[in-house]
């Protein structure tokens, strides 16, 4: 999974 899956 993406740990840095934050929106721009």
UniProtKB/Swiss-Prot annotation:
Tissue: Expressed by the venom gland.
GO cellular component: extracellular region
Keyword Secreted: yes
Subcellular location: Secreted
Superkingdom of the source species: Eukaryota
Primary role: May act to induce hypotension.
Protein name: Cryptide Pep-18
Organism whose genome encodes this protein: Tityus obscurus
